[in-house]
């Protein structure tokens, strides 16, 4: 991979304890390393089989990454494949999806940060907000990607068969266009607490987009975590120990439903539900 990165930003401190940052950035990466994808491999296999027709069926294998069972002898004898105009093939055993240099990727966006600290008689408070916004996420097809794109543009591959991984990728398949993180902390003496919120924007799942353009939208998801700390000393050596009780996903938010393994989009979400932990640390 080779990439060109550009960023520009500024920092403001309008009042004591308040800092505001803003950064605009762009990344252009050539020969991006990634997976071609099982779906793309099977579509590419289909394209090669239709293009080959019934020529050299004894040696033709289609896309070698798509490993198939032997064709059903009954279907061959009944002439189904001959009627369809393709060489006989069986069901897919597995797809060997290895990492490749695929395409040129361009990503542009900006980040906003707000940091505020204030000391009061009730304790010390700190607020941290970071918002990330993506304006552009595009991938120009190369290699097999380019072949698939050309065939779909020519009508050889139906428009309602999704080809993933090139074109405008923003807002689809886990590529949400915004993410917000807010953290509020409090401390007074030996006690401390925090509230953290994480929100990821919505996106659509291309594999469930219908031929009339109707999108299957995966809604945004917001998760809150809560912690309470207590610091104390062991053998009179100062506050060298800390115990923390935490609640992860305090509102028990579940991941939005998606057409993926386990029923949610694991590249973007987790689905652990509300969970707890206790952490004990000692500095010697």
Feature locations, PLM:
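C-terminal beta-barrel architecture of Gram-negative outer-membrane proteins
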Residues: 127-235, 260
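Residue-level signature of outer-membrane beta-barrel architecture
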Residues: 12-14, 116-118, 186-188, 197, ...
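Outer-membrane beta-barrel signature, preferentially recognizing the C-terminal barrel domain
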Residues: 1-21, 95-110, 117, 173-178, ...
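Flexible glycine-rich, low-complexity coil/linker segments exposed to the extracellular/periplasmic environment
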Residues: 41-107, 144-174, 185, 283
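Outer-membrane beta-barrel channels and translocator barrels
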Residues: 3, 15, 107, 119-122, ...
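Transmembrane beta-strands of outer-membrane beta-barrel proteins
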Residues: 8, 18-22, 112, 118-120, ...
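Short loop/turn motifs that connect adjacent beta-strands in outer-membrane beta-barrel proteins
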Residues: 16-17, 50-60, 64-69, 103-105, ...
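C-terminal beta-signal and adjacent terminal beta-strands/loops
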Residues: 19, 30, 135-138, 194-207, ...
């Amino acid at each position: 991979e080779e990439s060109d990165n550009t960023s520009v930003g500024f920092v403001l401190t309008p009042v004591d304890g308040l800092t505001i940052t803003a950064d605009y950035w762009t990344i252009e990466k050539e020969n991006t390393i990634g997976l071609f994808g099982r779906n793309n491999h099977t579509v590419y296999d289909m394209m090669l089989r239709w293009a080959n027709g019934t020529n050299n069926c004894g040696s033709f294998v289609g896309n070698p990454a798509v490993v198939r069972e032997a064709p059903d002898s009954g279907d061959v004898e009944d002439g189904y494949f001959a009627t369809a105009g393709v060489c006989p093939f069986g069901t897919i055993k597995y797809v060997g999806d290895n990492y490749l240099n695929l395409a040129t990727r361009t990503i542009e966006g900006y980040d906003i940060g707000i940091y505020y600290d204030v000391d009061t008689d009730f304790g010390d408070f700190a607020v941290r907000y970071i918002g990330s916004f993506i304006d552009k996420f595009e991938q120009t097809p190369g290699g097999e990607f380019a072949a698939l794109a050309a065939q779909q543009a020519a009508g050889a591959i139906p428009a309602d068969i999704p080809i993933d991984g090139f074109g405008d990728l923003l807002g689809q398949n886990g590529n949400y266009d915004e993410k917000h993180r807010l953290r509020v902390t409090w401390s007074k003496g030996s006690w401390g607490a925090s509230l953290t919120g994480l929100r990821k924007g919505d996106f659509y799942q291309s594999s469930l987009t219908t031929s009339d353009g109707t999108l299957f939208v995966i809604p945004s998801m917001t998760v809150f975590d809560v912690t309470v700390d207590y610091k104390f000393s062991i053998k009179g050596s100062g506050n060298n120990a800390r115990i923390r009780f935490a609640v992860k996903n305090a509102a028990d938010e579940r991941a939005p439903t998606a057409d993926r393994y386990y029923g949610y989009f694991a590249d973007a979400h987790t689905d652990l539900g509300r969970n707890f932990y206790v952490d004990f640390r000692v500095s010697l």
